Amino acid sequence: MADIWLATDERQKPYALRRMHERLRFNLLARRRFVRGAEILSKIGDHARIIGYVEHGKIKGQLYLLMDYVEASNLKQLYTQHDPVLLENVAQILIDMAEGLEHMHENGFMHLDFKPENVLVTRNASVRLVDFDLAEPIPEKPRKASKKNPGTPAYMAPEQLQGEPISHRVDIFSYGVSAYELLTNQKPFPGETPGEILAKQFDRSGFVPPRQYNSDMPANLEKVILRCLERDPERRYPFIGMMVRELQAALYV
């Protein structure tokens, strides 16, 4: 949807410049998503686990978003490459990305596309959440998922895939999928299509608990992940702050 460029100001301070692809210049839906994501980022407020917002606007018809520059790789790149930054800091990364989501929720927004590709990690293991194009305000009560807000099927909650009412708990499910994958290098509900993924989410007969792939995982950490992955949103954590506290206890006791 967009390219990221390195930009500098008159003092040579670096920034990350996100520009919408030229081929989407006249795509109204894509433009709305880009602007919405920029506006939501501007409203989330400063936080150590969220990419810093500078400004957004339009120059000669081209939409842009200017952000803090962070020299980093995304989380998927790190675990695909077995990067030592991840291997040495996995516990803190798990907590930091959860705290980023917690800050979003506390400020009234849900991400709706939380996945490893949208988590940046620097060489000193500092985490930043990015890409808020699909984010939306948290509704007062679960509302029907938009068919025009697809997300990424492998990380979507069952209610998202079915187009049923959604709430902030879809982010908790997506976090559980991401944490499971990070710790096992496997997806909890593998499938080539949204239908196949949804079928695995409902029929758990083939589900493999993460400790079967990674026996070094603390049992209490597995409990946190399994609660995040509950099919029924009411059985997941009611709010992500509770999950963060249990995650911290599981990883640092």
Predicted regions and their residues:
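AlphaC helix of the eukaryotic protein kinase fold
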Residues: 24-43
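Activation-segment/catalytic-loop signature of the eukaryotic protein kinase fold
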Residues: 56
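Conserved short submotifs of the Hanks-type protein kinase catalytic core
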Residues: 60-74
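AlphaC helix of the protein kinase catalytic domain
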Residues: 75-85
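Activation segment signature within eukaryotic-like protein kinase domains
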Residues: 93-94
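Protein kinase catalytic-loop region centered on the HRD/HxD motif
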Residues: 99-109
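Conserved activation segment of eukaryotic-like protein kinases, specifically the C-terminal portion
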Residues: 146-159
